[in-house]
Amino acid sequence: MNIPILVEPNYKERSVWSHLIMGAIDKTVLSKKYTVSEIDPRSYRSMDYDALFQNTPRLLLLIAETYDWMEQALSFFSEIHVDIVLLETDLSGYSCVKGQVTADHKKNIQMLLKLFSDCGCTRTALYGYYANSVPDRAKRFFFEKEMRTGGIESPEQLCFENRSGLADCYNAFYSRISEFDSVICVNGEAAVALAKNLTRDGIRIPEDIQIITFGGTELTATCTPKLTVMGVGGDLIGQQAVLTYRYLYHANTPEITCNVKISGGLFRRDSTRLPDSPAQQNTAEKKMPPTSTTKHRYYDDREVQELSALERFLFSCDPLDHAILQHLVRDISYDEISEILHLSKNAVFYRVKRIKGILGLQTIEELKQFLTANNYC
């Protein structure tokens, strides 16, 4: 069985999650002796799909995040009668969507709000959602639904949108900081940026405000304090993607669909208190956050670019890379590092050069500044 896969270009190039999911798919496919054909996302419209599928079911995996790109892709595949298994997104209304593998956003939001309630926190914000992200839309929908069920009349006032960049999102939130005792961040990039800014402005985490973020890469462990995470592993999504594809492939019946929702796991770190800790009481005025009409694309934001680079860097480094960098950031020379780690000086040099290339940096000093600025030690 061959599995064709199409990945949204920006998501493929800039998101560690896409690499984690693809890695899990490749591992599962290898264990079952299937094959994978990755479709070029820049030219998928001009591909000969009759030649690709021949006499097999017209079915492919689609990994994407942004609503506008996905809408165009699904409209195209509906027209040419190619069925789709969607990963990480819950988007109905298209005849071509026969399967979905996604996080159970409803259950995960309920779990996080229950955790905050057990901690004594009842004034929770949703932070950093990007309106063009299908997963972020789902998180906001279920957050607002749960808050409305809990008696909040205008839950949209508790949601802070990454409308024109994370800096503006933070400014809107900080102007109302005293209204909240807890925050759910939609992803690790938004959470790390929030934690850094709050710490800079003298807001203590978790004493003044508690933070939990969706996500689960090493990025959330780079800030101080380390962030509590609600994670749905990319390995599980990738594995379920292959199993869902196989089921639909062999069923090969238009009436059959298959939707898999995966509950997240909570990784408790330093940004939340134990349930029996008293929550700090605050009072505040109620007002709507400022709005912006600026057209904004998520990965155009400088802060997002820097955090994405950090995330890719952490994903790309092995334990030996980390050992070299930990010495380097302490101003230990190449000669001393090679002696300590029993490596040749050339090996140290080329590993550092590769890491600079990943981060788009030119000099050792730039690398040290990057590591220091991101609390790498």
Roles of regions detected by a PLM:
Residues I340, Y350-C377:
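Basic, Lys/Arg-enriched C-terminal extension of HTH/homeodomain DNA-binding domains
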Residues G99-L126, G165-N171, A191, V232-H250:
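Hydrophobic alpha-helical segments within soluble ligand-binding/sensing domains
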Residues Y67-K107, G215-L227:
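Flexible loop/hinge segments that line or gate small-molecule binding clefts
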Residues K98, Y174-C185, E189-A190, A195-Q280:
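Flexible loop/turn connectors
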Residues Q110-G151, I256-L274:
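An alpha-beta-alpha
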Residues P4-L6, T56-E65, D83-V85, A125-G128, ...:
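Periplasmic-binding protein-like
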Residues M1-A51:
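Amphipathic helical "hinge" segments at domain boundaries
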Residues R302-A347, T372-Y376:
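Helix-turn-helix DNA-binding segment
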